[in-house]
Every structure is written in C-alpha cells, then in structure tokens.
Curated annotation (Swiss-Prot):
HAMAP family: IspE (MF_00061). GO terms for biological process: isopentenyl diphosphate biosynthetic process, methylerythritol 4-phosphate pathway; terpenoid biosynthetic process. Belongs to the GHMP kinase family. IspE subfamily. ATP binds at P96, V97, A98, S99, G100, I101, G102, G103, G104, S105, S106. NCBIfam families: ispE (TIGR00154), PRK14608.1 (NF011202). GO terms for molecular function: 4-(cytidine 5'-diphospho)-2-C-methyl-D-erythritol kinase activity; ATP binding. The gene is ispE. Catalyzes the phosphorylation of the position 2 hydroxy group of 4-diphosphocytidyl-2C-methyl-D-erythritol. Pathway: Isoprenoid biosynthesis; isopentenyl diphosphate biosynthesis via DXP pathway; isopentenyl diphosphate from 1-deoxy-D-xylulose 5-phosphate: step 3/6. The keyword Transmembrane helix does not apply. It holds the Pfam family GHMP_kinases_C. This is 4-diphosphocytidyl-2-C-methyl-D-erythritol kinase. Its EC number is 2.7.1.148.
Length: 293
C-alpha cells in the first residue's frame, strides 16, 4: 500500500505581532490560508527505512534534521511497537526552504497524517496537534490545513470556514531568510490586533478586509533583504489587488482578480527573473485528501 498527499504552502494573508511573552516568544494574530500547490509526500511498505528526496528544492535536506524524519521518529517514540514497521518515505520538495510559506512545517504535518494512517494509529486531532507542536509552532495549523485565525504563539486555532478561494501568485527571490533574524530585527512588538475575522465574504470583500491589515514582519525582513521590496513592487505593477510578504519571508504573494491574470503575471516575472521561484496557484477551502496508490 502506498499513501500520498500534498503538503500545501501556508500563506499568512495577514500577520500582526501584538506582544511578546516573558520567555521571548512573540504573540501573533494571523489569518492563514493554504495553497493548492506544495510539496508532495508519500509513504509505502519497505524492508528497511528509506528516505528519498526529489524536486527542485531537495538539496541540503538530507539527514536527521529533516522535519519528515523528525515526525517519523517522534511517532515511534510515542507509540513504540505500533509504529515500528519499516517505511519508505519520498518527499518531493517543490517549495523553497526558509521562505515563509511553511514548507517544513507542512511537510511535518503531512508526515504525521500519512504515517498514522499507514501504521493504523488512531489519534484524536488534539493529540496529533500536541505531537505536532513538539516539531514546531506552525505544525498544528498545518495539520488543520484549512483557513484559520492563529493566535498566541501560533498554537490557538480558530477555523474560518467560509473564506473564499483566491487566485494568488507566489514569488520568492531565490534567497533563504531565517525566521529568528527577522524577529530579532523587529522594532515594534506591540501592534494593533487583527480586525474581526472575515466571514461569509466574497473575494472582493476579503481583499478589502486585507487592506485593513498588514504583515508586521515585513519591515524587519525588508531591512535584512531589500530585494523583497522589488518583489512586492513587481507584483503590484503586474496587477495584484494586494501584494504582501508571507510569514517571515522572503516569499511574497499577490492576490489577483482571476487565475488567468495571476498566471500572466507569473509568466512576465519569470521572464524578467528566471532564477526566482514563481508559481500561480489558489488558496483552498478544505484540507488536501490522502490518497491510496
């Protein structure tokens, strides 16, 4: 039996930094959506554990530090003999690393879902989310995999079930950006919270709501990597209704009126910057399905 599933890109449509705890963790409020595009993960029966990397961003992800292998090992630590049988894991890495769109966290979350299904381990969503939190603050929201408001340090999740699908263009200038460096460069750590969550809104109404919000990490990221400003200006020039950085960067997204306009903008930017990661996709209203092959 082979199981596979997409590990979707996580898009912070809005991200407000509203405080800082005494332990140093920042308090956030973020409207999060997930894209129809992402990495792809599969697991299948094997005589011995194997881990195969494929895709354009596979380099440098070998070894014990990989989020997927950490997810496998954490499940074995918790469930012992129930998770002992060997497994062949393949990760097709389609998302840039350290790019603000949750690639590693989404990989870990998808690994947890696939492996618990493969080993026939029954867990409650809350239990799996707690396991995921041990792998990273963003893993629980990636396990949820649907539009949501994240708060606290990212562990408090409130579903936003009526968020419309949005045509978006993802653009990364081909440079990794470390999250700790961005948070360390923050000047203001106590900002206004998000407006009331958008519900039952059309795509146009959602865009208007987003114009009332921001990504508070964007100025700090720009101070470290000024090319992010070029990305944002290009998205605006090519017709994005709104252009913003996702997460701690450096990936930016543009929301477009139609999928066709997003693709056309992507083609134009790719021609001007062939070394950049450019992908037209859309946000999705539900989590990706696990499939048997």
């Amino acid at each position: 039996m082979k199981l596979e599933c997409i590990a979707p890109a996580k898009i912070n449509l809005a991200l407000h930094v509203i405080g800082r705890r005494t332990d140093g963790y920042h308090l956030l409020e973020s409207l999060v959506a997930f894209a129809a595009f992402g990495d792809r993960l599969s697991v299948e029966k094997a005589e011995a554990d194997t881990f195969l990397l494929a895709g354009p961003f596979r380099d440098g992800l070998e070894g014990s530090g990989n989020f997927v292998l950490n997810a496998r090992d954490l499940l074995r630590e918790k469930f012992a003999s129930r998770a002992s049988s060997p497994v062949a894991i393949t990760l097709e890495k389609n998302l840039p690393v350290a790019s603000g769109i949750g690639g590693g966290s989404s990989d870990a979350a998808t690994g947890l879902k696939l492996l618990t299904r493969y080993w026939e381990i029954e867990t409650e969503p809350a239990e799996l989310a707690q396991i995921g939190l041990g792998l990273g603050a963003d893993v629980p929201m990636c396990l949820f995999g649907q539009p949501l408001i994240a708060s606290g340090i990212g562990e408090k999740l409130e579903p936003v079930s009526t968020l419309p699908s949005l045509p978006i263009l993802l653009v990364n200038p081909g440079l990794p950006l470390a999250t700790p460096a961005v948070f360390s460069s923050l000047v203001e750590r106590e900002n206004a919270p998000l407006p009331p969550a958008p519900r039952n809104k059309s795509a146009a109404e959602l865009v208007n709501w987003l114009r009332l919000t921001r990504n508070d990490l964007e100025p700090a990221a720009l101070s470290i990597m000024p090319v992010i400003g070029i990305v944002l200006r290009l998205l605006q020039t090519e017709g994005a209704l709104i252009a913003r950085m996702s997460g701690s960067g450096a990936t930016c997204f543009g929301i477009f009126e139609t999928a066709s306009k997003a693709r056309q903008a992507g083609e134009m930017i790719s021609r001007r910057h062939p070394g950049w990661f450019v992908r037209a996709t859309q946000t999705r209203a539900s989590m990706p399905e696990l499939s048997h092959v």
